[in-house]
Design a protein with these regions (language model features):
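Autoinhibitory propeptides
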Residues: 2-146, 151-172, 565, 573-574
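C-terminal subdomain of the subtilisin-like protease fold in secreted/lumenal serine endopeptidases
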Residues: 333-336, 340-349, 380, 392, ...
Length: 680
């Protein structure tokens, strides 16, 4: 559906959708005198916004202007360093009030996007700076700090424990911030395991390893909690240690975060788990030699993404929560003491502009620029996974050949899908003037970007929206296809059509991922694009052409290149991107996403991942073994989520090895970047 009202140009596509649909997807089922209805309950929740102010404006001026209107209920998060970014909680009025709010957004803000709702702050009238946590433990901070933003932190597992001089054990996990908004502390004899964060973020709970004596009263640390679940004869009861604290992600034998954390900071590095690399023979047994690198003894700060966020596999929620997670990790870094902070983020969307200008990408650029190791601040490095969408048919590319031109393709939605599905169409702003995007259902009902669709509607196309300083995008959505009492969208082949494409202009389209994240049971299914003309005329011959480990798809609108994780398309010295390769032959892992980024205004364009790391031992033995949620357990995680922590571990050492099989052709550089690195 075209937007139902004129929005400020800074409003992002998903904020617009939420307003147009009256925040339907954030609503709660309520009952009043037997009448059932859905409402966004502002007594329990606030909108959570990720804001970028204009270059000639300041966050402080925008904050002051919004706070002058009590009806907006604005609650700003801590300042994001000296950058142009801010996080903000507010009532719906703050983004719908035409008289006062909308003019302020137009005056001050360059971009604003919506994350999943959050509870109101406990202290709405006062804003705090980031709380300095660096000196609040029993031991002083070190020169190195590792941060992980993930799901599942097995802090009591043996690979993350160290032996004290007293003979006891202590976890190397300095702190965990669990972002689940309804998490409650466990109280034992008047002391709490898990503390709120009222002085800065004010949602979720944090769990510290230990506390300085002046701060320890009434608090139970991670080491204390481990001690409560340990006996000299039987060791640590990890099952009850996690279950009694409500760490639901650790109820499973496997967890995404447990694997990533072991690869990055475990005591047995990946090079000791795999057979010898050249000139050795990979078929020989691994050495199992304990690590002597800095990561094997480093302290870790872990941010646990909330269950609500992890259930939404699209990654639309990511920017605000990831930004605050990075701020939390940095709050443990001490000026002039902590020299390096390395943060691993293995999540990311398949959507976005893919030219380095997605809002979270530009925020990461600003943070690594500010935290560059000068002025007493640590050097910040962020390591990202390249993504796993190379073969998911989630990227369409079309270039106009005549004036004007048009293109159409199929968006295939499975039956019984339980979640809202999104796709995005992107073009350069200068080429978008005459573009019309149309979505047609399997039964023939059409929705257009220039026609307002009455509400409620099972599908729609948003009006053209400024996606960045250089781009225009159109949001395409289809509601769940599972049978329910409400409005049900058709499953099957929907058609997306783009008309008015200028000569030589490029159209890019991306499907938002919906298949569930690890251990998340949502009933969601993956949708994907199909080029019907290519399928009818060329797919048979293409299925007989197998080159460099891939079946040919030449001539198809579906492009495998240009599929990098939507957070991983900027070219920054402090932001690193890791793809995967197969140890057997050194080729890119079949699923590992490839570059290049779309062309944009940035001076440097990302061509591919920085490097590729071992992600599969062979084509039959996919994945890489690393730790599960209990001591001694291992499992194979398949995907570039296993590559990012390997590259991060090399970044910790600040000295990368010489890559093998360095690519020279543009196509191979887009796939494997600087070449194949041996595991750390």
């Amino acid at each position: 559906m075209a937007d139902r009202q004129q929005y400020p140009s800074c409003f992002g596509p998903y904020l617009r959708y939420a307003i147009d649909s009256d925040f339907e997807n954030f609503s709660t089922d309520l009952e009043n005198f037997g009448r059932q209805f859905r409402i966004f309950d502002e007594s329990q929740l606030r909108l959570f916004l990720f804001v970028e102010v204009k270059p000639d404006q300041s966050v402080q001026d925008f904050e002051q202007a919004m706070n002058a209107h009590a009806q907006f209920g604005t609650q700003f998060g801590p300042d994001v360093g000296k950058t142009q970014y801010a996080t903000l909680r507010c009532l719906k009025t703050a983004v719908t009030d035409q008289e006062y709010a909308i003019p302020l957004w137009r005056q001050h803000v360059s971009r604003v996007e919506l994350s999943l709702p959050i509870k109101p702050a406990s202290k709405p009238l006062k804003k705090f700076d980031i709380h300095d946590r660096s000196d609040e433990g029993k031991t002083p901070p070190g020169s190195l700090l590792i941060g992980l933003l993930d799901d599942g932190c097995p802090f009591a597992a043996s690979q993350f424990l160290k032996t004290l001089t007293s003979g006891g054990v202590s976890t190397r996990v300095r702190a965990i911030w669990d972002q689940n908004r309804d998490k409650q502390p466990v109280t034992i004899n008047g002391s709490d395991f898990g503390q709120t964060l009222p002085d800065d973020f004010d949602y979720g709970l944090e769990y510290r390893r230990d506390f300085a004596p002046a701060l320890a009263a009434g608090k139970i640390g991670l080491d204390d909690w481990i001690g409560l679940h340990s006996t000299p004869a039987n060791g640590i009861d990890e099952d009850s240690c996690y279950a009694e604290a409500g760490f639901t992600s650790l109820a499973f034998q496997t967890a995404h975060g447990a694997h990533v954390m072991d690869v990055l900071a475990g005591t047995i590095p990946l090079s000791s788990r795999l057979g010898p690399f050249p000139p050795g023979d990979r078929r020989d047994p691994p050495g199992w030699k304990p690590g002597t690198d800095a990561a094997s003894t480093a302290e870790v700060v872990f941010v646990q993404f909330s269950d609500d966020n992890l259930r939404d596999a699209s990654g639309v929620w990511l920017p605000g929560y990831a930004l605050q997670a990075i701020q939390y990790v940095l709050s443990f870094a001490k000026l002039n003491v902590t020299n390096n902070v390395i943060i691993n983020l293995s999540y990311g969307p398949t959507t976005g502009p893919h030219d380095g200008l997605w809002q979270l990408e530009t925020a990461l650029t600003a943070l690594v620029t500010e935290y560059n190791g000068t002025g007493g601040k640590p050097k910040l490095d962020v390591v990202l996974a390249a993504g796993n969408s190379y073969l998911t048919a989630s990227h369409v590319v079309f270039r106009g050949h005549q004036q004007p031109d048009q293109v159409e393709w199929i968006w295939r939605l499975p039956p019984d899908n339980t979640v809202l599905c999104f796709a995005e169409v992107w073009m350069k702003a200068g080429d978008a003037a005459d573009i019309v995007v149309t979505l047609t259902s399997p039964s023939g009902t059409s929705y257009s970007s220039n026609v307002v669709t009455p509400n409620p509607s099972p599908a729609g196309v948003g009006s053209p929206t400024p996606g960045s300083s250089d781009d225009t995008m159109w949001r395409v959505e289809v509601k769940p296809t599972v049978a329910s009492a409400g409005l049900v969208a058709e499953h099957g082949d929907w058609t997306i059509k783009v008309t008015g494409v200028p000569e030589h202009a490029a159209v890019h389209a991306y499907v938002a991922r919906t298949d569930p994240n690890m251990n998340m049971i949502t009933g969601a299914k993956r949708s994907f694009f199909v080029d019907p003309e290519w399928e009818a005329t060329q797919s048979a011959s293409a299925s007989c052409t197998f080159v460099d480990g891939e079946f040919d798809n030449y001539g198809s609108l579906i492009h495998r290149h240009g599929t990098l994780n939507g957070t991983a398309t900027a070219e920054d010295s402090g932001v690193h991107v890791a793809g995967g390769y197969v140890v057997l032959d050194g080729r890119k892992s079949p699923y590992s996403s490839a570059g290049p980024a779309r062309r944009g205004p940035l001076p440097h364009r990302r061509v591919g991942p920085d490097y590729v790391m071992p992600c599969d031992e062979s084509y039959a033995l996919q994945g890489i073994l690393a730790g599960g949620t209990r001591s001694g357990s291992v499992f194979r995680l398949i995907g570039t989520s296993a590559a990012a922590p390997q590259l991060a571990r090399w970044v910790v050492d600040a000295l990368l090895p010489t890559p093998n099989d360095v690519p020279t052709s543009p196509v191979e550089i887009e796939k494997r970047g600087g070449g194949d690195l041996a595991p750390p």
